[in-house]
Amino acid sequence: IYSSGFEDGDVSAFTGRGGVETITATDSQAYSGSYSMCISDRAKNWNGPQFLLDDKCEAGVQYTVSAAAKTEWYNSIKLSMEYTDASGERHYSNLQAQTSNGDWATFSNVKFSFSEDVSKVYLYFECNDKATMYIDDFEVRTAPVYPIQNDIPSLKDVYANDFKIGTAVTTEELAPQSTKDLIAKHFNSITLGNELKPESILNKAATLASG
């Protein structure tokens, strides 16, 4: 889907989340090759590079992202996904966190997916403070598709006379077709993961306005 070690100096696929960051290719740090992407002038901890997925990835398909990241000193670096739902609300999903001691931390084949009713889907990096951040060997790939095992009894059928078999899933977990197939085969009850939490169902602006 996309792969860059920034050896050609091109960082145009990435933008700053805060609008204040300076994003450049640098030969001062590199996980492999001679160059990496440098993100400096971060004013807040959530400032960092973001990568738009809308025109590169399809809804309902599972992907993996890999990268190497480091900061100037000890730090927790987070790889996350952001998307906007049909009502215009923005949501954030922490995919993985790694610790950098001033050395390179690696994110390897971290899975993600998103549903059809969302837009402005980004992968992004952030860390605990305003330290300069470096990213190298960034790659997004289509994840292997593993069909479910159909030649076994369905749990919901085995216990049909006793109780329901349920599971909890979030929107992004439910997006891949293989997950839908697995749930349809074995479960007859679903609990939404984060979608029923207060921040997902309450109108934040209206709540603040009413005091």
Where are the regions a protein language model picked out?
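Structural recognition of the beta-strand scaffold that forms the well-ordered cores
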Residues: 164-169, 188-200
